[in-house]
Amino acid sequence: MKVFLDTNVLASAAATRGLCADVVREVFGSHELFISEQVLAELRGVLRLKFRVSQDLIDDFIWLLEEDSVPAEPARLPKVKLKDRDDLAIVAAAITAGVEVLVTGDKELLDLGRIANLEILSPRQFWERLKTQQKRGAGRGEPRHSR
């Protein structure tokens, strides 16, 4: 599955243990991660200023994301009204790249639910969908991913 992880999901994964870290590991292990330069720039700032993560850890995490993801940049902004204009560029990048799911904790984006072919899910919704799909796949003799 083509997945775009929003800044808040990546920041939580890098700075804390828990669901977002599990989501990031699963996406790295079994899916195709898409990311934009905007998200990487936001992530650097959030990790440094909000979470007070060391510069070495920030550099390592950004390097990992750059190495193991597909670049996604916006072509045209969708005709959607959002308070945060930066979120429009993130949605546009995901749509332009043909991403299936945008995983975010941003309530305004989550309220949209879907834009074009892009489904917008919370980390919990995404995780539950993955686990449901894995159970179905395991029942048909398909490999079950575990991370």
Which residue stretches match the model-derived regions?
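Short active-site oxyanion
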Residues: 30-33, 98-100, 118
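Hydrophobic/aromatic ligand-binding patch that stacks against planar heteroaromatic rings
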Residues: 63, 93, 112
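PIN-domain endoribonuclease scaffold, especially VapC-family toxins
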Residues: 24-81
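Short, well-structured N-terminal submotif of metal-dependent ribonuclease cores
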Residues: 1-35
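Active-site neighborhoods of divalent-metal-dependent phosphate/nucleic-acid chemistry enzymes
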Residues: 67-102, 107, 138, 143
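Acidic, PIN/NYN-like endoribonuclease modules and their adjacent C-terminal/linker elements
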Residues: 36, 107-147
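Residues that scaffold the ATP/ADP-binding catalytic core of kinase and kinase-like folds
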Residues: 12-14, 46, 112, 129-130
